Design a protein with these regions (language model features):
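Short helix-capping/hinge SLiMs at alpha-helix to coil transitions
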Residues: 12-16
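Charged low-complexity interaction tracts in eukaryotic proteins
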Residues: 1-4, 18-21, 27-68
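Hydrophobic residues on short alpha-helical segments
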Residues: 4-11
């Protein structure tokens, strides 16, 4: 599963939004995305998705929310 797909999955479960650090930790702990180099998903990757998928994610009140 791609990082953005994992983020949608997690945010759909949690209706109140999540911080980038929480999203990265949840993706890694549940092994929803495995990087090719074996490193854990970083907060930077989560922010990349938020910034590059504005129709899907929004940032408000210190949390990332689903737009869909």
């Amino acid at each position: 599963m791609k990082v953005e797909e994992a983020m949608v999955f997690l945010l759909a479960e949690k209706n109140g939004g999540m911080k980038a650090e929480q999203l990265a930790a949840a993706i890694n702990s549940r092994r929803l995305h495995i990087r090719k180099d074996g490193l854990p998903v970083s907060v930077k990757q989560v922010w990349w998705c938020v910034n590059n998928f504005p129709d899907t994610f929004t940032y408000a009140e210190g949390r990332i929310f689903l737009m869909i």
